[in-house]
């Protein structure tokens, strides 16, 4: 990951941690915060800020609201994903409505992704 990032992103990440969406808040406080493998929220990764990041699993979780599906949203998301993937990170996009409508399924999916990634690296969860 290139170390050159916009210093304003650090302050912005702090703001985003303080002002999480209701879906981010739910996923963080009801699942990821206590998850046995550490996740960070609103993590600066190069020139981007990831919603949730698990270094051990090399996994980025992005929660996508409606703005991600209109205008330039899909193109920006594709650029972000390509940027992060070139550093060996897996980027997974989860729609906000999946968090509110199928929370258990979302948690099971994330759990599966983390376990697959960590065990493929040769260490138990």
Residue ranges, per PLM feature:
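Nucleic-acid endo/exonuclease domains
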Residues: 1-125
